[in-house]
């Protein structure tokens, strides 16, 4: 890789007050009775609510009434149509940026009455994905580089390279084969820049010995310099954000088609199923980590897997997602020679297998029992039966850690598994509403909490 030294980022600015967003006067809404509330823990229940769709935005999938699941008192509206909307970040002057890797651009949404004004802030990029601000400096992660742009009043200046030569499908050794080329970026309180570099495949052991190493989170020092591995064994850490105390967190897409690791019967025939790929086991293993990253941390992939079983290896075991230990991957590390799984720190928090967590951000002072916490856009499974549904998940911030998952926004998947939307990222706005991108529906939703 080649690298240039950026200037020291300013401290992260708090966005100023934004003009009140007025609801559109005419909308379509579901008229059927809402389903019974669903418990999400911590005293929060979900109720059915119509998705409010302004006139002019009511094209598929919003050409018919849609109902979402939210905590009681919240309302949700379709705020903007943005094709293939992915990650998002608020500018210091109260506008929302949305990345679109497929289109190679970053869209700028300027709030006003009704639908926000939409313009293109950046174009001609190579799969832009991660977005982050440090003061008035915008960081954009493309598939092969991270650049810093001076931002002012809806415009950016010339880019300053932070890290280039990052591995992507154009890398000579990959010859176009890169399953997780999209990068995410976050900026620490000290100005260090963190970049996620995904694995090339589901189980690609060569990533750990590649140069530069893949399945990592890299760190560029404050003031610039050579990126170095901050954390490894991070299969696809699309979710990347800095917590309220300055800690770095990642929400990780973990591996698929895991083999049963225990020398015991699991399918009821009496013989050992060790090394067998069993659908019933694959459906719930391994968990998707939501982990605090520290210098040198290893999340195990592809040699060790975090295990949600309260009773390891027992069919039908209760599933637990907090503080989970690792077990050997019997396909890649059967004898433990590749990596000592017992030596790895337990994963702080997690989600159900194949949830596909994408965007990660932190919110402050959400109403009721929610308070501060992490927001995770969960895309939903692609290879599980029944499918794990898409949602926006909330993890309460408690004493420097994250509590158990709660659903903040659901209802995107029908009983038969059909979906009309798939959230990618949720970010709290300067107006305290929560804004949610959806790349399947080509939408940005606005979630308004109840009045305090």
Describe the function of each predicted region.
Residues 33-69, 182, 200-202, 215, ...:
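Beta-propeller domain segments
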Residues 26-28:
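Bacterial signal peptide processing site
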Residues 127, 144-187, 199-202:
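Asp-box/WD-like beta-propeller blade repeats and closely related beta-sheet repeat scaffolds
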Residues 97-99, 140, 193-197, 249-252, ...:
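Residue position within the beta-strands of beta-propeller blades
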Residues 427-452:
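Blade-level signature of beta-propeller repeat domains, shared across WD40, Kelch, NHL, RCC1
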Residues 21-24:
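C-terminal motif of bacterial Sec signal peptides marking the signal peptidase cleavage site
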Residues 82-93, 123-141, 171-192, 232-247, ...:
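Beta-rich, blade/repeat-based domains predominating
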Residues 100-102, 143-145, 151, 198-200, ...:
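Short loop/turn segments immediately following the C-termini of beta-strands
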């Amino acid at each position: 890789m080649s690298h240039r030294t950026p200037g020291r980022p300013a401290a992260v600015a708090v966005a100023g007050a934004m003009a009140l967003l007025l609801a559109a006067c005419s909308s379509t809404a579901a008229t059927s009775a809402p389903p019974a509330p669903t418990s999400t823990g911590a005293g929060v229940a979900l109720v059915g609510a119509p998705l409010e769709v302004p006139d002019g935005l009511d094209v598929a999938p919003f050409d018919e009434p849609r109902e979402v699941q939210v905590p009681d008192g919240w309302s949700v509206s379709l705020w903007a149509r943005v094709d293939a909307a992915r990650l998002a970040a608020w500018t210091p002057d109260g506008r929302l940026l949305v990345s679109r890797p497929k289109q190679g651009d970053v869209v700028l949404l300027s709030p006003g009455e009704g639908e926000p004004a939409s313009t293109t802030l950046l174009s001609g990029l190579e799969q832009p994905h991660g977005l982050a601000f440090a003061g008035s400096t915008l960081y954009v992660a493309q598939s092969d580089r991270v650049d810093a742009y001076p931002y002012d009043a809806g415009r950016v200046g010339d880019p300053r390279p932070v890290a280039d030569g990052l591995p992507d499908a154009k890398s000579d050794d990959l010859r176009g084969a890169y399953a997780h080329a999209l990068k995410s970026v976050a900026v620490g309180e000290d100005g260090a820049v963190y970049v996620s570099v995904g694995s090339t495949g589901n189980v690609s052991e060569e990533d750990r010995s590649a140069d530069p190493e893949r399945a990592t989170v890299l760190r560029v020092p404050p003031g610039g310099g050579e990126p170095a591995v901050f954390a490894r064994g991070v299969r696809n850490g699309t979710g990347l954000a800095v917590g309220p105390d300055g800690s770095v967190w990642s929400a990780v897409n973990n591996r698929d088609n895991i083999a049963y690791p225990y020398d015991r019967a699991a399918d009821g025939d009496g013989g050992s199923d060790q090394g067998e790929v069993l659908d019933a086991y694959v459906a719930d293993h391994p968990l998707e980590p939501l982990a605090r990253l520290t210098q040198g941390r290893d999340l195990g992939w592809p040699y060790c897997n975090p295990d949600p079983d309260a009773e390891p290896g027992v069919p039908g075991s209760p599933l637990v997602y907090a503080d989970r230990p690792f077990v050997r991957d019997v396909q890649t590390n059967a004898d433990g020679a590749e990596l000592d799984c017992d030596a790895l720190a337990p994963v702080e928090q997690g989600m159900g297998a194949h949830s596909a967590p994408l965007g990660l951000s932190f919110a402050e002072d959400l109403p009721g029992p929610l308070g501060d916490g992490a927001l995770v856009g969960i895309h939903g499974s692609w290879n599980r039966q029944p499918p794990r549904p898409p949602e926006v998940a909330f993890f309460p911030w408690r004493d420097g850690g994250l509590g158990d998952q709660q659903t903040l926004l659901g209802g995107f998947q029908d009983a038969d598994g059909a979906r009309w939307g798939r959230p990618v990222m949720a970010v709290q706005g300067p107006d305290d509403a929560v804004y949610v991108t959806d790349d399947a529906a080509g939408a940005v939703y606005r979630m308004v909490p109840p009045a305090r």
